[in-house]
Amino acid sequence: MKTNNIILAISLSIAIVSGCGKSSKTEPINLIMETDIGNDIDDAIAMDIIYKAVDAGKVNLLGVCINKEGSATGEYVDILNTWYGHPDIPLGIIHNGADCAADARNYAKAVVDMRTPEGKPAFARTLKDHENIIEAPVLYRKLLAGAKNKSVVIASVGFSTNLSRLLESGPDEYSKLTGKELVEKKVKLLVTMAGDFENPKVHEYNVVKDIPAAKKVFEEWPTPVVTSPWEVGSKIKYPATSIENDFKWAGLHPMVEAYKAYMDMPYDRETWDPTAVLYALEGEKWFTLSEQGFINVSDEGSTLFKPGKKGTRRYLLVDDEQAEAIKAHFIEIVTSRPANRK
């Protein structure tokens, strides 16, 4: 009897060890971030969320492409990359993009210009030249050409200019495919922050700053698209009390300093861009998804959804309970320390 018990115990031990040897870990998401950082502070919050996902091994951040013009934007993202401990993430910038220089306080420039009492830059940089960063559509082609088929998720939380230019691009040193062919082959999903589906008379900012580009992307992008519309992020506000009280450990923090520079404190800010990033990283568990269909952009910049089983466009919705849960989740992520600062 004892012999049988010993044999059973050994068998169970082997089974447990064998089970532990099987990894249930999901593969990290290959993500490209597309942002108009420097316009609204929610881009900086969205970047924080992405860096924490990189720290956790949930994301490979292949690159950050910027659709707001000006050297301060690229330099600010370089500061973020460096501060969060990911200095080698490639950057792509835009030239001759949407005219948005006077649309808001440029918190990116405010942080770039910050100095210590000794007159030195307040934040470290990695790049030596912020004027000659690669053009975003070229970086897209380089990154997509090197990626596995249907492996890349793009989170676009600004204007559609870079994505439109990518679709229009031709063969180059990185790929013989056209831009549209390259996207169709390599991209799994595009997640955007754009539009408004509760009120068709609303002309949402990310759309109206480049209406032709938004039209092209929503109507011609060859993979599934999920968009987080204005009405979702407007229900979920990041609290000023968190900015004021939850970062005492950090000293100078480039996201916190940007938040303080963007508007007169204290203010709570809508989380339009973080909601799109959250869906790109964690999927629909926090949201309700619309049915499948088509999204068209009017000449004035309205976004119109038409249901259809053959459509590949969907948009996010949230009720009050979901909004509260997402807000708490954002606070938990954003107030946590980056891996390089624990």
Provide a role label for each language-model segment.
Residues 1-27:
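Bacterial Sec-dependent N-terminal signal peptides
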